[in-house]
Amino acid sequence: MELPFRVLVAAVVVGLTVPTVFAGLSAYESQQLSVRAIQTIDAIVRVAQEIYLSGGGVEDVRVDLEGGITARIELIAIGDSQDGPLAATARYQISGQGEAFLISDPQVPMTGGDGALRVGPGRHVVRVSHDGEGPVRLAVVG
């Protein structure tokens, strides 16, 4: 009779602690993914700034937006359409959260062609190019 009672107590304790552990893991992963999204945006925007200020060029930036167990980077969007009001901005979204906005400094206009460069979960190669005129062009090439 004592063994089934111990098993029952153990099951209750596990049942009470699992949601707390899961919530903590989810919060930790969301925070880590937010840092990774900001670092990714910073890497792309820094290259765009260097190319824009130097008068032109092309460079590829590798990005890793793989997700975790409880959260993932849903979207990174950089720039806007040509001459769009958000051309010097970037935004990202982690699953279960609202979009976070960032502004490049110095402000450099960037475009993904018809609008913002949009990158979802996974590993990608982003080509950053500028021909000396207009905004810096961003494209996913791999």
Protein language model regions, located:
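N-terminal single-pass transmembrane signal-anchor helix
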Residues: 1-24
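N-terminal alpha-helical signal peptides/signal-anchor transmembrane segments
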Residues: 40-55
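Short, glycine/small-hydrophobic-rich surface segments
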Residues: 51-72
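Intrinsically disordered, low-complexity regions enriched in Pro/Ser/Thr/Gly and acidic residues
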Residues: 69-142
